[in-house]
């Protein structure tokens, strides 16, 4: 099964860390990613740009409205994601708990449904 690990971050938490600790966490992240890549569980993952570069798109009555910024105001925002493939929700949550970010910010774990399960024909 595939699981999306949504990494929420608060930039103030990162900024409050000493530079050496930031570097250490980046090293941990690299080692962690290597480990789950070698185990075959890593599918993809990337950081997201700051919310100041975001746009929100809404279509109402055939009209497209594009606004700068995220949909909601919050101290935490989605900062990145990991897509993993593993046998169970339990394993996905174990992987999420090992993300260095989990020490400071929440990680949301969601199973990805396949098209048939969602009610769409497989294509």
Residue map of PLM features:
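Conserved, structured core segments of small domains
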Residues: 1-123
């Amino acid at each position: 099964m595939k699981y999306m690990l949504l990494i929420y971050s608060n930039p103030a938490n990162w900024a409050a860390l000493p530079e050496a600790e930031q570097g250490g966490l980046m090293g941990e992240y690299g080692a962690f990613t290597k480990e789950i890549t070698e185990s075959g569980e890593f599918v993809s993952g990337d950081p997201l740009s700051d919310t100041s570069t975001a746009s929100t798109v809404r279509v109402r009555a055939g009209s497209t409205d594009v606004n700068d910024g995220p949909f909601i105001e919050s101290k935490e925002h989605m900062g990145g994601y990991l897509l993993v493939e593993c046998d169970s929700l339990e394993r996905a949550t174990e992987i999420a708990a090992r993300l260095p970010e989990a020490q400071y910010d929440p990680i949301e774990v969601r199973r990805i449904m396949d098209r048939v399960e969602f009610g769409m024909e497989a294509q």
